[in-house]
Amino acid sequence: MDFATTTEQRDLADAARRHLSERFPPSRLAATADHGLLDPEDWAALDRQGWLDADLGPVDLALLAEESGRALLPQPWVGTAGSALPVYQSAGLPLPGPAALVDSSDTCAAHDTPDWRISGSAPGVVDAHLATELVVAATTRQGVALFGVAPSEISIAERDDIDPLRRYATVRLLHAPARLLADPGRTAELLPALRLRSAMLLACEAVGVADGALAEAVRYAGTRTQFGQPIGSFQAVAHQLAEAYAEIETARSLAYRAAVTLNGDGAAEAVACAAVAGPRAAVLACEVALQVCGGIAMTWEFGLHLRYRRALWLDAHRVTSVPPHDVLAALLLS
């Protein structure tokens, strides 16, 4: 299996890194975390940069997800690109803007001629409060179908969570008007693919979070001196950084493998491996960075806490109700 990226893919990742570092400096991330204000122009800029192009393949998306994690991108791109964009592409419709998938078994749809109406609830929809339209998986008489619902037609209760840059919301629908995006037959193919795609992108995002934390720790270890020399020269520090590096490289290889195999045989196993390794590497790298950076890492201004919060969020988040460890165990033991 060839994991080597093409020149075009490397250029895409480099351009994404430059764009995000210029647009989202630490001071802006801190302000967004404190006040929760997002600039719609940021989403438009991502669109102009090609982050939502229909011709992006899984590897392209994986590289963008990694860069979004490195920069802690405070826009709902991962959720939109992972679990909503393919629905609109399949339906031949333009993406209306940021979108969130409501993947719940507690929603049902009835055909109230000429419209569809949806009722039900979902307790943990990521970035639902930022969506211009929600893609709702709802049960019909013929099976589960996918619908588009305007946020103005439903109740969205945002809730505080460990990561102030990515929040859950409880979504409640009561006879909400909806438009059909995918019938039950198409949905039966789309939903499993959406879940795999979303899990793959989150694993790649976790690699970016981890790599960003390690870079901060290495930079600090090279400039902070103790006993007349950089603290990075001490084995107690160097060994921790090396351990984090090894964990990140393993997670990166598994994430790229998941991207390469996403549309082929073995995708479920590859994605499960990446979903286990990515968040684990992110948590470890952030905890190592906190230890290496010492007291300054505990300050709100330093910003490392935002990386750690995202790592913990990624480690706790589940694309489906089945944890990836259980998915992997079932696949290996079957």
Identify the function of each model-found stretch.
Residues M1-A71, L196-S334:
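Alpha-helical interface subdomain recognition
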Residues Q75-V78, G82, P86, A91-A215:
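FAD-binding core of flavoproteins
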